[in-house]
């Protein structure tokens, strides 16, 4: 039904599933996704939050909450949720460009560059601090760090 864009039908079916099992994270996430598709982002967040109470490491809920927050203009919060998802599953290729675009919207080009490279938020400050200390650009510092890491392996 999602593929057919019948989101109202998905909502009805998921409500039935949730009545049977209120901890069905698949149904909760599907509710949120369908609500997102219907531009009901605040409602969607409630379902992602419920999922995250049940499983704080549910990457689907983290990513979709980030999407909802982004649609609502809460870019920094969205970035933080993408970052949590990235810490749990660093193989997700859609996270770095999504974080980068949000940093661009916040007019933070250095962070946008680092996010696009897959750098976690917690590691950005060190790179920025090292660049300042070494009197070089963020780009140069990142490349220098990558070169050093490659040679140490």
Predicted feature residues:
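Terminal, low-structured helical/coil segments at or just beyond the last alpha-helical repeat
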Residues: 105-153
């Amino acid at each position: 039904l999602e593929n057919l864009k019948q989101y109202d039908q998905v909502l009805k079916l998921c409500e039935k599933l949730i009545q049977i099992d209120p901890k069905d994270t698949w149904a909760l996430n599907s509710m949120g996704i369908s609500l997102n598709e219907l531009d009901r982002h605040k409602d969607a967040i409630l379902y992602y939050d419920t999922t995250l109470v049940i499983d704080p490491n549910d990457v689907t809920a983290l990513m979709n909450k980030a999407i909802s927050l982004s649609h609502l203009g809460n870019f920094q919060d969205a970035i933080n949720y993408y970052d949590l998802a990235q810490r749990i599953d660093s193989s997700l290729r859609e996270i770095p460009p999504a974080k980068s675009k949000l940093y661009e919207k916040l007019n933070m080009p250095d962070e946008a560059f680092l996010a696009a490279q897959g750098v976690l938020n917690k590691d950005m400050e060190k790179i920025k601090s090292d660049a300042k200390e070494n009197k070089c650009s963020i780009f140069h510092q990142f490349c220098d760090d990558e070169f050093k890491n490659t040679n140490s392996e």
